[in-house]
Amino acid sequence: MALPILLDCDPGHDDAIAIVLALASPELDVKAITSSAGNQTPEKTLRNVLRMLTLLNRTDIPVAGGAVKPLMRELIIADNVHGESGLDGPALPEPAFAPQNCTAVELMAKTLRESAEPITIVSTGPQTNVALLLNSHPELHSKIARIVIMGGAMGLGNWTPAAEFNIYVDPEAAEIVFQSGIPVVMAGLDVTHRAQIHVEDTERFRAIGNPVSTIVAELLDFFLEYHKDEKWGFVGAPLHDPCTIAWLLKPELFTTVERWVGVETQGKYTQGMTVVDYYYLTGNKPNATVMVDVDRQGFVDLLADRLKFYA
């Protein structure tokens, strides 16, 4: 039986590819997709969800737009990474359908309420919508199987020296998620920076030759440009968000540890840092499954295999 999931995202090139991977996988049943502000403004990320679902001919999936800003801060966007539209590069279709006439939190709550079994929430942007859901609907916590997030890092940040972008945008929301008591799975930079797509991988995807694999290759062409900066030391581009979906499909590709994670919301230099108690120094019980490594080739092979679904 397919695993029911709710996807909360801020497309974004890697979010878009996470959507492609999820909808090519019969093991997953995507119940709804909600958008968050992050990689671009809330209007643009919502539009990008609709554009991707139009491309994939999945206009049956309910979509709703989420919070327009973080819980307690002004919005920061990553237009330097994802371009003016949030999905610069390929020519994507205009949306062929409209979002639901409700908020992301309302759609999430309705989906959880109507489900006969607990649902996994996959969140690949800032955690604002998920935190609002948890705070406003404590009665639905038992309907959430787990929350799989792309965010954070045990080691180095990518937006500040200490902080990964998604967590930095709304650290208060991330702290609510980690301390919620619901099982959390964290795909942080420690693993996503190992999930790099090389130029030859992009050409492999392009050679699959269907419209969706071609769009994915064109998304990666654009995404690779930002990551060519020598400061990163990358061979290719880290495909952050699809790690969440890949873990659900093939957890054996990933090495994980069970640890306590907290989020720094106050620090002068460390605001947005995910503090991972790797050596059990705090005495706190683990609250997260933290990904620390990935079989890169297996990850690439999974993506290539699933792109053939769109032939």
Curated annotation (Swiss-Prot):
GO terms for cellular component: cytosol. It is an enzyme of class 3 (hydrolase). One of its GO terms (molecular function) is uridine nucleosidase activity. The active site is at H240. Its EC number is 3.2.-.-. CDD domains: nuc_hydro_IU_UC_XIUA. Belongs to the IUNH family. RihA subfamily. Hydrolyzes with equal efficiency cytidine or uridine to ribose and cytosine or uracil, respectively. This is Pyrimidine-specific ribonucleoside hydrolase RihA.
